[in-house]
């Protein structure tokens, strides 16, 4: 789902991963400038923005710190935390994801109304929908812009697509559905006979929870 990221977020993620996968989560200033092909002012402003974003996302376990004597940057990260949490947060804020999430629950009379809802320009919304439709057609889905703007396709394909979309974007970090709690679905599933429901892994259990939530919408 990284293809959903806009260009600015892609550059932030590239910088984050460059530092994260370096030895001891530390990269020198020279490595970052050369490998990412950016200028020093861009490096400084991007790191400042990333740290602001991380705080805004609520992930206090992460931060990029600068070591002046060594001219290096280190990603401070708590144990058992994954950089994927930050990447997922950027994905959730991307125009493409915002469009898909918005169209799950509502249709719009025209593109202008949708563009206003997701805070994208009219030309931008047309571009994003065109690119999304290239992906959606492979799943027999599409965003229709005829009489109204809506996502169309058979119900089963829609539910599978959104269950997977939300599972990847939200993962185990948070639960995106306000109308039902995760533990309520757990109770429901545990009351089912083992012939119907048996989760052999955490990933499988989470996927089933998201799929059930989509059916309850």
Please state what every model-predicted region is.
Residues 1-217:
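A cross-family "folded-core" feature that marks the main globular domain of proteins
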């Amino acid at each position: 789902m990284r293809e959903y990221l806009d260009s600015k977020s892609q550059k932030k993620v590239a910088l984050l991963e460059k530092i994260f996968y370096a030895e001891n989560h530390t990269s020198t200033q020279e490595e970052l400038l050369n490998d990412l092909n950016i200028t020093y002012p861009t490096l400084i402003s991007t790191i400042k923005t990333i740290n602001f974003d991380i705080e805004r996302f609520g992930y206090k376990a992460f931060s990029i710190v600068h070591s002046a004597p060594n001219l290096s940057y280190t990603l401070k990260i708590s144990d058992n935390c994954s950089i994927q949490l930050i990447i997922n947060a950027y994905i959730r804020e991307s125009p493409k994801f915002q469009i898909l999430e918005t169209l799950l629950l509502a249709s719009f009379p025209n593109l202008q109304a949708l563009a206003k809802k997701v805070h994208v320009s009219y030309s931008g919304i047309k571009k994003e929908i065109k690119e999304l439709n290239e992906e959606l057609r492979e799943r027999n889905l599409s965003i229709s812009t005829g009489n109204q703007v809506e996502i169309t396709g058979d119900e089963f394909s829609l539910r599978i697509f959104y269950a997977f979309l939300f599972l990847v974007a939200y993962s185990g970090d948070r639960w995106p559905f306000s109308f039902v709690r995760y533990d309520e679905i757990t109770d429901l599933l545990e009351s089912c006979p083992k012939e119907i429901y048996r989760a052999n892994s955490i990933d499988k259990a989470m996927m089933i929870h998201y799929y059930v939530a989509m059916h309850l919408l």
